[in-house]
């Protein structure tokens, strides 16, 4: 299946994603229903599934309107929320075969306790919601957020094949790289990507694979990068370094 990406240019800088082939469509975390409905109608597709990574409003606001247009579409989510109940409750390791494609569910709490990611192995794509961002990770402001769970979820993602591409729900490239450079100012990867994305519209920013993400993401590098021991000598690599970086990012 092909992957269509839109940037909403709202205050949260949301990305929206749709997978499609000649006949079928899958929507991920719809905030704005109209862009999906227009594309599906124009290309004469059938909306088969709506996948929800977590229940924050900017990931579910468009679900009810899409279901009004496409009542046969099935909603997949870890838990219910204030707007709807899913047709199919998913859990860690759930494997869903839709016939025209399939996906596996990864339970990735930390940003919020109901967060999941959707791994499409054939498409080599991971829809990672607010767990992993380009050059960053999700925030831990929600009531059910847990910084240690977020670390464990990130570790789980880093164990996937390096050629898989993560598709995060927001464009936070610049802010994340600016934070990374505040810690490691001379780092070649941080500087390279900061220069690369500085002048790009969000729609044109690169979609990198996990192998490349591991080089440009300071939170992944917290697991093993000895350069961080010089920058933050009071903290050991791994969970302790990750937690410290996430705390510093909260106030950046």
UniProtKB/Swiss-Prot annotation:
SUPFAM superfamilies documented for this protein: Metallo-hydrolase/oxidoreductase
Keywords recorded for this protein, A-Z: Hydrolase, Metal-binding, Zinc
Record field: catalytic activity: an S-(2-hydroxyacyl)glutathione + H2O = a 2-hydroxy carboxylate + glutathione + H(+)
Leader sequence segment: none
Pathway: Secondary metabolite metabolism; methylglyoxal degradation; (R)-lactate from methylglyoxal: step 2/2
One MF term in the entry's GO annotations: metal ion binding
EC supergroup of this enzyme: hydrolase
Entry-linked Gene3D superfamilies: Ribonuclease Z/Hydroxyacylglutathione hydrolase-like
Textual note on the cofactor: Binds 2 Zn(2+) ions per subunit.
Cofactor: Zn(2+)
Membership in a protein family: Belongs to the metallo-beta-lactamase superfamily. Glyoxalase II family.
HAMAP family, per database record: Glyoxalase_2
Descriptive protein name: Hydroxyacylglutathione hydrolase
Gene: gloB
């Amino acid at each position: 299946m092909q992957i269509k990406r839109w940037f909403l240019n709202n205050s949260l800088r949301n990305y929206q994603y749709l997978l499609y082939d000649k006949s079928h469509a899958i929507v991920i975390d719809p905030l704005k229903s109209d862009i999906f409905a227009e594309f599906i109608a124009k290309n004469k597709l059938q909306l088969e599934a709506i996948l929800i990574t977590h229940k924050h409003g900017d990931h579910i606001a468009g679900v009810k309107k899409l279901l009004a247009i496409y009542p046969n579409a099935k909603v997949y989510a870890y838990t219910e929320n204030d707007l709807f109940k899913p047709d199919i409750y998913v859990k860690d390791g759930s494997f869903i075969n839709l016939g025209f494609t399939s996906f596996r569910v990864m339970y990735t709490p930390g940003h919020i306790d109901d967060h999941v990611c959707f791994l499409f192995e054939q498409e080599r794509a991971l829809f990672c919601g607010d767990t992993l961002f380009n050059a960053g990770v999700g925030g831990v402001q929600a009531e059910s957020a847990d910084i240690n769970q977020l670390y464990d979820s990130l570790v789980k993602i880093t164990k996937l094949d390096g050629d898989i591409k993560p598709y995060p729900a927001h464009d936070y490239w610049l802010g994340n790289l600016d934070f990374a450079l505040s810690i490691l100012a001379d780092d070649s990867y941080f500087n390279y990507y900061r220069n690369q994305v500085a002048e790009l519209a969000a729609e044109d920013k690169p979609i990198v694979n996990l192998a490349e993400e591991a080089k440009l993401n300071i939170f992944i590098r917290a697991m093993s990068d000895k350069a961080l021991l010089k920058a933050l000598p009071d903290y050991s690599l791994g969970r302790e370094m990750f937690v410290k970086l996430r705390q510093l990012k909260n106030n950046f």
